[in-house]
C-alpha cells in the first residue's frame, strides 16, 4: 500500500509499533493503536488514514483490542477532519453468503471472530451516518502474493512444496475459493482512498473472477515450481488434533465453514467503476 500511495502523494506516514520505511521519503511514526493519545498524534496533519492493522489471530486479543483501536481511529479522524479507509475482511458475512459474496451480502457472522468484525464495522458506519465521518470500507477475500505469509496458499501449498513436502488444503479441495492478490488489494485500496465519490460505501477489492478450486491452485503452483501436485486435506479431525499443539491451527476451527463450501468473492462493482 505504501508503494501504491507513491502514485498519489510523496507524503506517506507509516504508523506502527516498529515502522520500517518502504519509500525513501516515508515518515516513520511509532505508536500503539490502542493508545488514544498515540493515535491522535499519529493522525494529525493527515488527509487520509488507511487502517490496515492486524492483531494476533486470537479471539481474546481481537475482543480486547479491535473496538478500542477502531474508536481511537474514528475519534482522531473526526478531530483532525481526516478521511478514513478501513481495510476489512469477509468474516462478518452470513454463512449462506459465502458462495457468492457482494457488498450487499447479509451481515450475520456465524463465528466469534466474525462478531468482533461486525462490531467494529457498525462502529464505523455509525460514525459515518451520525457523526459525519468521511470513510469507506475496502474489503478483501483471502490473500495470496507478496507479504501474505500467513495465507492458506502460502502456508499450505507454496511453503510445503518449497520444503519438498505434500501440500495441504483446508476442508475440501474441490470447492471454489476466491483469492485476492496482495498487489491488487494495495492498488485498489490506494485508488479508493483517492477517489472522492468512493466514500460512504463498501467496496470489494479487485479479485480474479475465475472460479478456481483448491485442487486447481495446487496444480498451478506445482506446475510453476516443477513438482508433483501431492496434497492432503486438513479436515475437522486433523485441525482438532493439531490444534492441541498449535494455537494458530486451533484458531482456524471456527472458520472451517468458509472452506466447507464454495467461496466466491464478487468484485464487479469495483471493476465497473474503475
Language model features by range: what are they?
Residues 156-178, 229-263:
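Alpha-helical membrane-targeting segments
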